[in-house]
Curated annotation (Swiss-Prot):
Name listed for the protein in its UniProt record: Cyclin-dependent kinase 2 homolog
Species the sequence originates in: Plasmodium knowlesi (strain H)
Subunit and partners: May form a complex composed of at least the catalytic subunit CRK2 and a cyclin.
Active site (catalytic residues): 125 (proton acceptor)
Cofactor: Mg(2+)
SMART domains recorded: S_TKc (SM00220)
Principal EC category: transferase
Highest taxon, organism lineage: Eukaryota
A single Gene Ontology CC term: nucleus
Family annotation (Gene3D superfamilies): Phosphorylase Kinase, domain 1, Transferase(Phosphotransferase) domain 1
Length: 288
């Protein structure tokens, strides 16, 4: 820690306190002091292993992990620092982002996700708060892989991995299969929020979250999602909703944008588009 000074607390993240600090050359960093669930046990070796993988991730749309400082009792991750996040930006942009900005952010988000998925690293907790933005309009994804390294704190169940509003229906119904589609669902929710200026599914509980999804996208059944009936929390007595036309709840998104979003927000995870496929979509070929 001697290398860093001028510590200024800038927030409390999912995993602990975040500080802004400078090194001896005047460069600014974000220091994430990881909160350990069991203080007396020290840092789990699995966490160290996962973090060492994150140091290898090098992509312009992923927040760079520069350094890992670990003593017996604590772990500090040293990341590059960015001043703004997407949530703060959306809070001040009434009615959503301009279409050219939303498209640029989505393209960068998918580029970072595709890179990590190719390296077999999932995010599992994507939300506007951990998409950081700099003054040049560059977007970088923060907290990649931390869900796997440390688990999502305070929750006792491994399937509770994504902040409620961005959580995929398969996870909400108890699926333990963590794979790349859970991140794609979150990306779709973020895309819709950038366009609309408000969350698409702002649920207050897991059940409410599912019902909000079904009210818009329709209630799944074995015809449109063959394995849905096998999920632990599937209920044959779910209220049956018909899907709404996309135009009714998405303002200002053209047909190709709606087509891309509809491929991300498929109820059945096996039918969701991959990040790599999404990058080739016609939505990115047209000029806004």
């Amino acid at each position: 820690m001697e290398k860093y000074h001028g510590l200024e607390k800038i927030g409390e993240g999912t995993y602990g306190v975040v500080y802004k600090a400078q090194n001896n050359y005047g460069e600014t960093f974000a220091l994430k002091k990881i909160r350990l669930e069991k203080e007396d046990e020290g840092i789990p070796s699995t966490a160290i292993r996962e973090i060492s993988i994150l140091k290898e991730l090098k992509h312009s749309n992923i927040v760079k992990l520069y350094d890992v400082i670990h003593t017996k009792k604590r772990l500090i991750l040293v990341f590059e620092h960015l001043d703004q996040d997407l949530k703060k930006l959306l809070d001040v942009c009434d009615g959503g982002l301009e279409s050219v900005t939303a498209k640029s952010f989505l393209l960068q988000l998918l580029s970072g996700i595709a890179y990590c998925h190719e390296h077999r690293v999932l995010h599992r907790d994507l939300k506007p708060q951990n998409l950081l933005i700099n003054r040049e309009g560059e977007l970088k994804i923060a907290d990649f892989g931390l869900a796997r390294a440390f688990g999502i704190p305070v929750r006792k169940y491994t399937h509770e991995v994504v902040t409620l509003w961005y959580r995929a229906p398969d996870i909400l119904m108890g699926s333990k299969k963590y794979s790349t589609p859970i991140d794609i669902w979150s990306v779709g929710c973020i895309f819709a929020e950038m366009v609309n200026g408000r969350p698409l599914f702002p649920g207050v509980s897991e059940t409410d979250q599912l019902m909000r999804i079904f009210r818009i996208l329709g209630t799944p059944n074995s015809a449109n999602w063959p394995s849905v009936t096998e999920l632990p929390k599937y209920d044959p007595d779910f209220i049956v909703y018909e899907p709404l036309p996309w135009e009714t709840f998405l303002k200002g998104l053209d047909d190709t944008g709606i087509d891309l979003l509809s491929k991300m927000l498929r109820l059945d995870p096996n039918q969701r588009i991959t990040a790599k496929e999404a990058l080739q979509h016609a939505y990115f070929k047209e000029s806004s």
